[in-house]
Regions:
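Conserved glycine-rich cofactor-binding loop
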Residues: 17-18, 41
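Conserved glycine-rich Rossmann-like NAD(P)H-binding loop of the short-chain dehydrogenase/reductase
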Residues: 33-47
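Active-site helix of classical SDR
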Residues: 131, 167-170, 175
């Protein structure tokens, strides 16, 4: 018996064509899951959907804004009509907003309240709403795996990213709350966990970590000096644990939030 087998499972990935979500979507399709990519832009999702199909695997796109409950309900109806069920939900939609990020010498009072609201809405509500809408369908079947994307910034205080960190901390707490609620009300086959990625270079943080000439910024050096593995992560290094949580191999695992950070959070610097 292969505990890691997810062949034929229906896996929803919000933000499934972004850097992180796209890596997960492609990987899960290669493991035999039917991947449903949820996002706002069919045009942006098309190259990934085409690649999935070219490799002989299954995947399709459903348009929805994760911050719009009615959008998500319509998406749920489309998915249940086409795929009949939801086995896996991965909430990969999220990101930072510049106005909710501070310079090292900038007081918090300069933060733009409207951008604080945006980053909280995108990350926190953009995770909670899909859990409620798609989770209802999973609860009806009393089985499935929900995987949220928190952040190492939720577990350790970082300078500058106050809005993003606060939103991800909310996701961490909500993940644990929902896991307890689901297990007690719907049984032990419906699980909720989260991953907390450390530092992975992507489009959103590239300018903060990499200088125009390709050298590392001062912030990057601070990060790497406090990362025992001494390097940034590669997005593909998230896929193994996502696979584990999505499969029956993690059947007794719920309410966990795992840092995937090269040891950053465990290092005191001494």
């Amino acid at each position: 018996m292969n505990l890691f087998n997810i062949e034929g499972k229906v896996a929803l990935i919000t933000g499934g064509y972004g850097a992180l979500g796209g890596s997960i979507s492609l990987y899960l399709s290669q493991q035999g899951a039917e991947v449903v990519i949820i996002g706002r832009s069919e045009e942006k999702a098309a190259p990934l959907i085409n690649k999935i199909k070219e490799e002989g695997n299954k995947g399709y796109f459903v348009q929805a804004d994760v911050m719009n409950v009615e959008d998500l309900r319509k998406a749920k109806d489309i998915i249940l009509e086409r795929s009949k069920r939801i086995d896996i939900l991965i909430n990969a939609a999220g990101g930072n907003v510049p106005g909710a990020t501070l310079r090292d010498d900038q007081p918090i009072f300069d933060m733009k309240i409207e951008d604080w609201d945006k980053v909280i809405n995108l990350n926190m509500n953009g995770t909670v709403y899909p859990c409620l809408v798609f989770g209802e369908a999973m609860a009806a079947e009393k089985k499935g795996s929900i995987i949220n994307v928190s952040s190492m910034a939720a577990l350790s205080v970082l300078t500058r990213v106050v809005g993003y960190s606060s939103a991800k901390a909310a996701i961490t707490n909500f993940t644990k709350w929902l896991a307890n609620d689901f297990a007690q009300k719907y049984g032990d086959k419906l699980r909720v966990n989260a991953v907390a990625p450390g530092f992975f270079i992507g489009e959103q943080n590239r300018n903060v970590l990499i200088n125009p000439d390709g050298s590392l910024t001062e912030r990057s050096h601070k990060i790497l000096n406090n990362t025992p593995m001494g390097r940034f992560g590669d997005l593909s290094e998230l896929n193994g644990y996502i696979h584990y949580l999505a499969s029956d191999a993690s059947s007794f695992v719920t309410a966990t939030v795992l840092p995937i950070d090269g040891g950053f959070i465990a290092y005191s610097g001494v």
